[in-house]
Amino acid sequence: MDLLGIDEVHLVGIIGIGACIFQEVAISRPDLAKTMVNTGTWACPDRKVADQLNLWLEVHKVMGFEAFQKMVTMEGFNPEFYAQNKEKLIGPNGAWSDLRDNVATHQRLTEAALSHNTLDRLVSIQAPTLVMHNGLDFITAPRLTMPVEQNIPGAEGYWMRNAAHVVTGREARIEFCNVLLNFLEKHSG
């Protein structure tokens, strides 16, 4: 950002390792972080999510990408959306298709996710922060997102009780966008 001449940015980490990376940016560059938004995140992986990530990698290695894609897609989307969109979600251009034929990349992603640990450093985040908790998220469940909110001074939390890991459906996406845009507007200026 320095090379681009950008002084402050909104760090919007939506689902997964991107949200974790933005925790690191907010910690190491408080001058750069105007705000931070985290969804589908964690401060430190617990045993269950570690086993889940390792299982996905093992399935990818042993059974192939298609089996991995089916497994993670069923866990990532709510049942109605999955049933209505299965043909789009699974296949060559479906969910997580960037990992097709990329077991090495999947391995690095898993290692990065498992080594992420900001729990004792979140207290140093100064940027206004919004952490969203999705009640039906079976991947990064609220047991993982709550410690992020609780350990960042002044962080705001927002619960989407009926949202899965990936927020889908018109009403849920509108709700998500309204919460996100209202938070960013409140802290712009």
Can you say where each PLM-predicted feature lies in the sequence?
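Short alpha-helix in the alpha/beta-hydrolase fold that links the catalytic acid
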Residues: 127, 141-148
